[in-house]
Amino acid sequence: VVAALNGVSLQRITDRLMQFTGEVPMIVGGVSQTISSRSTFHSDLGIALSFIVEQYTAIGIKVRRVPYKVRGKTFENIEAEIPGTTNPEKVVLFGAHADATAGSPWALEAKTRGADDDGSGTIGCLELALAIKALKLPYTVRILHFTGEEQGLWGSYAYSDMIKKAGQELVDVVQIDMIAYCAKPGNRVDIHDSVDRNGSHATVVKFFRAIKRYNIQLTPVDTHNHAVDNRSDVAGFLDHGYRGVLISEEFSDDGFNPNYHTLGDRVKNCNLPYMVEVVKASIALAADLAGAP
């Protein structure tokens, strides 16, 4: 696990986040393209999703598109999976959302940035996947990139409904949303368990222990409140009885990102060394949840 944490690359995170937020071009389908918006209703979100798919394919991770319908329109989530070595039927799910808004989520927004919200979680999950693949863990780790989050958690509700209906059991659900803004000393990171809903506090304890065990440079805070209830993609899973938490930067106090849902949510306004630490903590947690010794 230590080697996996040391492999987290600030440069790779920076490069991908610059591409994913349209600051620089990305290569998708062999063509250089610059995305202008990740609005749920903008065609460029499709390019962004293809970028995610190609990143997984390039590192040899199985990935698929999972369509769902809202109001007669078809949208897609992206699902990547790293099979467990001994107990592949046990599944740990990590998630982030690929869509973004600059303040008018119901409009077809011509321009969004969404570096922190939730480019950070998206690119963080790609980095996590690379580490998890190398670790060869006993349990399966599945990574979801949801869409329609800014319209009311469309993609994650659809996906959680689908797997519950199929009788899929999950060890745990960890949503990573907004992990790249920290303007105060101390590197505070919040973990939300909706006040131990479905026994989710056990995951909070594991998160704290992982940070301490690997000397990760973060100050974790167990928010122990209902501030993010139904505001994050973990909501649908909690509704169905799964254990689940949200990992985020300081979300409910005075350290909140002032660029939230504006065109100012850009890479230059993010704290990427802080994000690296949160990604490391997420990898350490994933390893623990997926049966690492």
Question: Where in the sequence are the language-model features?
Answer:
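N-terminal capping segment at the start of a domain
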Residues: 1-44, 215, 255-266
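Extracytoplasmic/secreted proteins, especially bacterial periplasmic and envelope-associated proteins
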Residues: 3, 12-19, 43-60, 120-127, ...
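Extracellular/periplasmic catalytic domains that process cell-envelope and extracellular macromolecules
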Residues: 7-13, 57, 71-74, 83-89, ...
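Structural recognition of the beta-strand scaffold that forms the well-ordered cores
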Residues: 12-21, 64-66, 77-81, 91-96, ...
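A non-catalytic alpha/beta surface segment that caps or lines the substrate-entry region
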Residues: 15, 22-83, 219-221
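Solvent-exposed loop/turn segments at secondary-structure junctions
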Residues: 26-27, 62, 68-73, 84-87, ...
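Acidic/histidine-rich catalytic neighborhood of metal-dependent amide-processing enzymes
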Residues: 74-77, 108-199, 230
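Active-site-adjacent substrate-binding region
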Residues: 182-293
